[in-house]
Swiss-Prot record:
It is found in: Cytoplasm. It comes from Cyanothece sp. (strain PCC 7425 / ATCC 29141). The gene is argG. L-citrulline binds at Y89, N125, R129, S177, S186, E262, Y274. Its main location: cytoplasm. The keyword Methyltransferase does not apply. Pathway: Amino-acid biosynthesis; L-arginine biosynthesis; L-arginine from L-ornithine and carbamoyl phosphate: step 2/3. This is Argininosuccinate synthase.
Length: 401
């Protein structure tokens, strides 16, 4: 008896997920494989991918256009949270996993599948993100992970696929593992496994080399409503169009590259290269607008929430009770985060040069040092005395002979 009768497989068209199809059938006795490819704005023609799944042995090959949901329900929530894992990675790949997991669970219910499957290996974070998200959405649904168990090297996996007529797009001269969606690209493996090796320029697609960027700066005004980006230079765009347009405008100036040593959930360090032009600039601009519209204590407290939030998303806990509780707090903080942020794009730098909001808590009359100054300077002496009283009492007890 096989491990499952009918399986919905998360499918990308790559080597691992393509090999999963014959492997599930011939090694694990699965009777029917349904593949699901999610269109998250990765730029691939999905009809050839759908056809490749059928050619690889799938009975049904599905394509789900999930771009709008991806941006509105996942990316925008992360922007409101200023989510940066280890203060650098904007979770462009990690954010896609809970959405794909939801699509798998929904497809399994629709087609009566008794299991879902993915092509993640046992070393990465994605296996955790898929398995935990699926368990949160349907704890009774079986999850199969062939690549985690088959014990084949990359070369052996390619050879196995070739036995079943599956061509490999990976060339010896380009051994990188690449994941892409509308939010960005992640690149790893091959020469990048040496943390001292400088990445070749050829691995970058969304961002221009600094030497090739324009010699004049470009300015973009990003409009936010309740923490959600809604416009560029005063023109409203749909969520998908806004990200797409901003990616192009930011990337041409060489902005959005990340080269980092990352601490994976499974306990190992990994060298990762990311491109996320729009997402990084939006988080940068959003955080600046918060500094204008939130009180100091809320803003400071939210910083700690943001770190926890980022770890939860990175660690596959998008659907966890704690994540939902943090969502409620973050949404409350965003009610007044509306306004416009002006960003200067030039030679790899995105510099905030202006911000404005009808909800601004900045008072020019209180902040100025000019004649218009309305701050009561005489009040400072009493404030300083009360503020410093605990320190003064401590000093009298400890330092006084």
């Amino acid at each position: 008896m096989g491990r499952a009768k009918k399986v919905v497989l998360a499918y990308s068209g790559g080597v691992d997920t393509s090999v999963c199809i014959p492997y599930l059938k011939h090694e694990w006795g699965v009777e029917e494989v349904i593949t699901l490819a999610a269109d998250l704005g990765q730029g691939d023609e999905l009809e050839p991918i759908r056809q490749k799944a059928l050619n690889s042995g799938a009975e049904i090959s599905l394509v789900a256009d999930a771009k709008d949901s991806f941006i509105k329900e996942y990316a925008f929530a992360a922007i409101q949270a200023n989510a940066l894992y280890e203060n650098r990675y904007p979770l462009s790949t990690a954010l896609a996993r809970p959405l794909i997991a939801k699509l798998l669970v929904d497809a399994a219910a629709e087609y009566g599948a008794d299991a879902v499957a993915h092509g993640c290996t046992g070393k990465g974070n994605d296996q955790v993100r898929f398995d935990v998200s699926i368990a949160a959405l349907n704890p009774n649904l079986k999850v199969l992970a062939p690549a985690r168990e088959w014990g084949m090297s990359r070369e052996q996996t390619i050879a196995y696929g070739e036995r079943y007529g599956i061509p490999s797009p990976v060339k010896k001269s380009s051994p990188y593992s690449i994941d892409r969606n509308l939010l960005g690209r992640s690149i790893e493996a091959g020469p990048l496994e040496d943390p001292w090796t400088e990445p070749l320029e050829e691995i970058y697609v969304m961002t221009q080399a600094i030497a090739d960027t324009p010699n004049s700066p470009e300015y973009v005004e990003i409009g936010f409503e309740r923490g959600i980006p809604v416009s560029l230079d005063g023109v409203a765009f749909s969520p998908v169009d806004l990200i797409d347009r901003l990616n192009q405008r930011v990337g041409i100036h060489g902005i959005g590259r990340i080269d980092m040593i990352e601490n994976r959930l499974v306990g190992i360090k990994s060298r990762e290269i990311y491109e996320a032009p729009a997402l990084l600039v939006l988080i940068h601009a959003h955080r600046d607008l918060e500094s204008l519209t939130l009180t100091g204590d809320v803003s400071q407290y939210k910083r700690g929430i943001e770190e926890t939030y980022s770890k939860l998303v990175y660690n596959g806990l998008w659907y966890s009770p704690l994540k939902e509780a943090l969502d409620a707090f973050i949404q409350q903080t965003q009610q007044r985060v509306s306004g416009t942020v002006r960003v200067k794009l030039f030679k790899g730098n995105a510099t905030i040069v202006g911000r404005k909001s009808a909800n601004s808590l900045y008072s020019p009359d209180l902040a100025t040092y000019g004649a218009e100054d309305q701050f009561d300077h005489k009040a400072a002496e009493g404030f300083i005395y009360v503020w410093g009283l605990p320190t003064r009492v401590w000093s009298q007890q400890v330092r006084t002979p």
